[in-house]
Amino acid sequence: MRRRHRCVALLFIFSAFITPLGFFYYTISNESKRYSEESEKNYGYQTLEFTESPEEISVDFDKYSQSECSRFPSNVEIEYPECLNKMKWIKNGWKTHHCYIENHIDGSECSFRYYLSQVENYCPPMEHHGKRKGLAKISPSIRRLLPIFESIPHYMKTRINRLWKKWKEGAHEVMQKYPKSMIERRKLNVLVFIGFLANEQKLNMAKKSDHGGPLGELLQWSDLLATLSVIGHHLEVSTNKNTLRNIVWKYMSRGPCQYVNNFRQQLDIIFTDIMGFNILRQHHRQFLLSNRCRIRLLDSFGTHAEFTTKTYFVQNKKSLSGPFSQRNPWGGHGLDLRQHWTFYPHSDDNTFLGFVVDTEGIDKKNNQMIPSALVYGKEQYMWRDAEKPIDVLKRIVTVHSTVADLDLKDSNISSIFKKVQNHGFLNSEEISQLLDNITIFFGLGFPLEGPAPLEAMAHGAVFINAKFKEPKSRLNYKFLAEKPTLRKWTSQNPYMEKIGEPHVITVDIFNELELEEAIKRAISLKPKHFVPFEFTPAGMLHRVALLLEKQELCDKIAYSKRWPPIDQMKIFRTLNADDSCETICHSKQLLCEPSYFPIINSSPLLRRENLCSSTTSDSSPFAPFNCTIQQSAFLFSCASSPPISFEINRLCPCRDYIPEQHAICKKCL
């Protein structure tokens, strides 16, 4: 009997302990699943925010008379171009939505002044008012991104996790180097819509990334998400049309006030790609019209002025096209060229976003002695017609490859792969280990401007960069035939070409003597590990933080507040008839700055510079030139080169830049 009582007691204790525990785990599991499902269903995926309670705002409009509040400095129209019009509107418009009352507007002049100077930034503030807008803080915790992990491909999750230690180190570094750039930044609402993933069923790009497919886009999106999270902005991420619709509806249903209780109500920036832009245009036209200036388009190869509007391209498509295509499927968006954010800093008209070079796990102490090369080409088609250069390479070094679609048991395998150690598809960690033991990273001429050469350089390998006998462009190369740019590729990677020795040797790989000499030279160089600052976590954090804070494309900005600062502008005229503004600026060790074009597009300036008695106007990517000013803001162009027969001299605005950080001028900090 006692034994039975003991058993019952033990059973009771056991159940009393286990049942709540089981219920706890069941609840957590379900809550986690419910959060994930509701997050996707109702909001899209957002960063997990640790928000503080709203600040209690105390305002006293009796400190100033109504006449004092309506009195503005004499230079108000210069320093605050929209202030007086906004004051005129709000006197009648403040009753149109309750959010104005929530921001302490009561119909008095002082409440109008308070709102337009402290809540918004349209007017000069009254002296006693303190700033109250939410600020972004460096947040190097991966926890903020965990809800977003539900929606992104495996490769992106793996990369963000793998590099998170580097992101934290980068955050510390940038705060040490550039503290003034990283504090007092507005906390922005940022929508990230990865358009090509919304078309994943057709493209299978995420699926292919795990089996040797192209990684450039996924890599850049991964680094952008990490950057935006670390620099402290609020993210809304969508990878499909359903979550995009819910996010759009949420913001469209909010009132007109930018802030309520110190919390930002409106979207500030929308990152997407060309496929995503087309989805917005097709399904959310009104939203796009309202937020067009907030779009930032990830555009790897960049876009030139000739392709940004459909009208100009159609009128000139014969001269802008080669034998392969006369179409412009990736252009015609009508955006400011600075809204196109690129993979490399190759186009002064566009904005450089970039990516981060993976240096996780690099063995800097590894002094490998046996000369070896890894061929840059992870699919068989990239090796086509490369037998001669590969044979030269085999004669001198051990050759490795990572061709994912190569079956060594196939009886029809090309002879080019004989005596090549193929490792097949490797993940990031395995690639890193292989690069630690490689002397030469050997380019075959394609892919153009991928991330791999920078990673090889980070491991201390010399990149042999394939030089082209004739520069490649949309006019003569099928791969580029529909890209919205007239850029000319002189080699596989022009950015690496500029870096040069000891890290890069650019050579015609089909010239046997020159190639053999280059290979032997590469073996002897033994360069140190090197990553340009703009491709480090600290460099990307610094660049993106400044661009989001300073690059203004929506509102009228006073000259004194423009960025880059106007006092950094240097004006030159082109020397040769076919020079672009990039050509003349680069020859002075400067960059062409597109934001300065409206300033120099002035009849008095042209008359003074070119000794003109009068000026005309023209919608041309070469204007302003000679005695002609630019008629279309869409056609201002740093990159456009006029035909020699035009016999014109362009007027060009240039600026300096921080070494290894092209996007930022020396006084832009």
Curated annotation (Swiss-Prot):
It catalyses: N(4)-{beta-D-GlcNAc-(1->2)-[beta-D-GlcNAc-(1->4)]-alpha-D-Man-(1->3)-[beta-D-GlcNAc-(1->2)-alpha-D-Man-(1->6)]-beta-D-Man-(1->4)-beta-D-GlcNAc-(1->4)-beta-D-GlcNAc}-L-asparaginyl-[protein] + UDP-N-acetyl-alpha-D-glucosamine = N(4)-{beta-D-GlcNAc-(1->2)-[beta-D-GlcNAc-(1->4)]-alpha-D-Man-(1->3)-[beta-D-GlcNAc-(1->2)-[beta-D-GlcNAc-(1->6)]-alpha-D-Man-(1->6)]-beta-D-Man-(1->4)-beta-D-GlcNAc-(1->4)-beta-D-GlcNAc}-L-asparaginyl-[protein] + UDP + H(+). InterPro entries: GT18_cat, MGAT5_Glycosyltransferase. GO terms for cellular component: Golgi apparatus; Golgi membrane; Golgi stack; nucleus. One of its GO terms (biological process) is protein N-linked glycosylation. Residues 29-669 are lumenal. It is an enzyme of class 2 (transferase). Its main location: Golgi. Keywords: Glycoprotein, Glycosyltransferase, Golgi apparatus, Membrane, Metal-binding, Signal-anchor, Transferase, Transmembrane, Transmembrane helix. Expressed in a complex subset of neurons in larvae and in the spermathecal and pharyngeal-intestinal valves and certain vulval cells of adults. Pathway: Protein modification; protein glycosylation. It is found in: Golgi apparatus membrane. Glycans are attached at N30, N412, N437, N626. One of its GO terms (molecular function) is alpha-1,6-mannosylglycoprotein 6-beta-N-acetylglucosaminyltransferase activity. It is a single-pass type II membrane protein. Changing L116R: Loss of function. Residues 1-7 are cytoplasmic. Belongs to the glycosyltransferase 18 family. Catalyzes the addition of N-acetylglucosamine (GlcNAc) in beta 1-6 linkage to the alpha-linked mannose of biantennary N-linked oligosaccharides. This is Alpha-1,6-mannosylglycoprotein 6-beta-N-acetylglucosaminyltransferase. It comes from Caenorhabditis elegans.
